[in-house]
Design a protein with these regions (language model features):
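Long, amphipathic alpha-helical coiled-coil segments characteristic
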Residues: 2-48, 74-97
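Hydrophobic helical segment of the DHp/HisKA dimerization and phosphotransfer domain
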Residues: 46, 53, 65-68
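Short helix/strand-capping connector loops at secondary-structure junctions
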Residues: 61-73
Length: 97
């Protein structure tokens, strides 16, 4: 996670950063079940996660999602892992604040 990216984007406003990260975490909890193997509509969810992740500086997550869009459902475990890593990084970042 590139939190510097988000900090620059939010002009250092800690309130905005906190709100954005909290919203991402809440959305991640809704996205996760939609990434189960065999889930219908997974491609749309992956596309949404790609944009949301890149928007907060989760470049690796965005790249994994782009790869899954191109390759297919077999990469959903990789997407789930990258999403979990992004959420863990957010938790650690927010714990420091």
């Amino acid at each position: 996670m590139d939190f510097d990216y988000l900090e620059r984007f939010a002009a250092g406003d800690r309130t905005v950063i906190g709100e954005v990260l909290t919203l991402f975490r809440e959305q991640a909890a809704l996205w996760a079940p939609k990434l189960a193997d065999g889930a219908t509509g997974w491609r749309e969810v992956v596309h949404t996660i790609k944009g949301a992740g890149r928007g907060i500086g989760a470049t690796v997550l965005g790249d994994v999602c782009a790869e899954a869009e191109a390759v297919g459902e077999s990469l959903l475990p990789k997407v789930r892992a990258a999403l979990a890593e992004a959420v863990a990084a957010i938790d650690a970042y927010q714990a420091r604040e």
